Amino acid sequence: MISSLLSRSSIARRAVRGFASTAVQLDASAKLNKPARFAQPISASDIPKGFVVSSTYAGIKAAISPKPADPNTSASTAAASNPNPKPDLALIVSTVPAAAAGTFTRNVFKAAPVVVSNQVLLDGAKKEQGARVQTVLVNSGCANAVTGTQGMQDAESCVELVKKHLAPHPGLAQSSEGRETLLLSTGVIGVPLPMPTIKRCIPHLANGMILRSDPESWRETARAFMTTDTFPKLRAKTFKLGGKEVRMIGIDKGAGMIHPAMTGPAVPSAVSSGQLHATMLGLIATDAAVQPKALQVALNRAVSRSFNCISVDGDMSTNDTIILLANGQSAASSSTAVANEIDESSPDFEPFVSELTAFCQELSKLIVRDGEGAEKFVEITCTNAPSYTVAHGLLSRLVTSMLFKCAIHGQDANWGRILASVGGADPSLTKDVDASKVSVSFVDPTGEFESITVLRDGNPVKVDEDEIGKLLTKEDIKVVIDLQNGKEDCTYWTCDLSREYIEINADYRS
């Protein structure tokens, strides 16, 4: 009799939760409208001085699609059905050679553009003036990854084409020093770039007449980064260093194949595959004057607390790259002047790192917000850990747990999945975790609902299922894991796993 009543009670709870979940999902569908909520305009006054951009539609994905063209559809008819296609090829140019830094995927199967860009920064670091770059070429639709010798040749051809066709632009420095080009590619893996298409479009992009630096041009450039993204991820801001105004602008993309673990430029033998986790790409440009070595240190620190702390589906891309350019034009008296550069000993270095880190976190969280099919945004903090490495490693394990992500999607406070995942991490991470000290809480970042502790000092806490159920209906949810065994902390950002994620990735190449 008792077991029968318990069974009926369980069925009733599931039914109520099911009705509530359906209602919330319908409500979420109406509210999610990510482009309207997160695609923000930028102010012209926040655009860094000395950078110009151009973009165009090349038809890259259409050129490599395995889906045969409809013989009954003419080219003119196809064009008419999509009169304003999304750009898929873009050029970002600094009017003077800019200090450059980058972080790149640790995936063993690094894409050709990653290898080429990594080498440019390595070679530049050996020079007296450090790594200097003037242009970045971006394409979406084709990753140029796992494409063998042909892929490397195509990447190098892109660099040469940009050098050849970059027309003189008003104020564009013509010195041969520092006129290097970096590459960013995203899209389908295992297919070569459609070089006839690329060769046709680069001269157009490099034409000084269309290189501009207005908000709309930057927005179109951000759209050129997009694959399964639902909105262009573009942000810009102005801040002060040493009492002087400097500007920073950033573009990133990503919605799937997101679990970066990037490192700075390194020779292949010096980088392990790490934790093998659509590609995450990012470009940040500032008119602050920062010495290249210091710029790389700043980017490494910022990325470790931002882009390397996000996950959508646990898969590391072959193409993950973040590029940072600093051209020093904020304090320039002319288009070719470069102010004294900040180094690691400068009083402005730590403030710059702080501003950069906050900016990277803002950009990286947009990727999670736009996670393929995502309906929930989850912030997870591991506090009082013995080291940052331990905290980061435990969270990196948790955010790849399909059971945890499904529970979040279903608004089910099944906190046992959190502990099962964290506890199953590598022994090198868990050896200093004392299960009898761990506490877990669910938090509403908006403050509408009170925080609810479900585990305290290793012991479960009886909670009101209705109250925690209400908290989990929120779009934004925070989970706090307190190890009570140190002073370090780490925060990760992830999303739920929905049916739409499967639908998107089942049809990715078509």
Swiss-Prot record:
How this protein is processed and modified after translation, per its record?
The alpha and beta chains are autoproteolytically processed from a single precursor protein within the mitochondrion.
Residues that bind substrate: 227, 253, 279, 372, 505, 510
Q: Which UniProt keywords apply?
A: Acyltransferase, Amino-acid biosynthesis, Arginine biosynthesis, Autocatalytic cleavage, Mitochondrion, Multifunctional enzyme, Transferase
Report the function annotation for this chain.
Catalyzes two activities which are involved in the cyclic version of arginine biosynthesis: the synthesis of acetylglutamate from glutamate and acetyl-CoA, and of ornithine by transacetylation between acetylornithine and glutamate.
Biological process according to GO: L-arginine biosynthetic process; ornithine biosynthetic process
Extract the SUPFAM superfamilies matched here: DmpA/ArgJ-like
The answer on whether this UniProt entry bears the keyword Transferase reads yes
Active site positions: 279
Q: What class of enzyme is it?
A: transferase
Q: Which domain of life is it from?
A: Eukaryota
Which Gene Ontology molecular-function terms are recorded? glutamate N-acetyltransferase activity; L-glutamate N-acetyltransferase activity
Subunit structure, per the record? Heterodimer of an alpha and a beta chain.
Q: Which residues does the UniProt site feature Cleavage point to?
A: 278-279
Give the family per the record: Belongs to the ArgJ family.
InterPro entries linked:
Arg_biosynth_ArgJ, ArgJ-like_dom_sf, ArgJ_beta_C
One Pfam family hit = ArgJ
UniProt catalytic activity: N(2)-acetyl-L-ornithine + L-glutamate = N-acetyl-L-glutamate + L-ornithine; L-glutamate + acetyl-CoA = N-acetyl-L-glutamate + CoA + H(+)
Query: Which pathway?
Result: Amino-acid biosynthesis; L-arginine biosynthesis; L-ornithine and N-acetyl-L-glutamate from L-glutamate and N(2)-acetyl-L-ornithine (cyclic): step 1/1; Amino-acid biosynthesis; L-arginine biosynthesis; N(2)-acetyl-L-ornithine from L-glutamate: step 1/4
EC number(s) per entry? 2.3.1.35, 2.3.1.1
Q: Where in the cell is it found?
A: Mitochondrion matrix
State the protein's name: Arginine biosynthesis bifunctional protein ArgJ, mitochondrial
Site (Involved in the stabilization of negative charge on the oxyanion by the formation of the oxyanion hole) residue list: 186-187
Q: Which GO terms describe its cellular component?
A: mitochondrial matrix
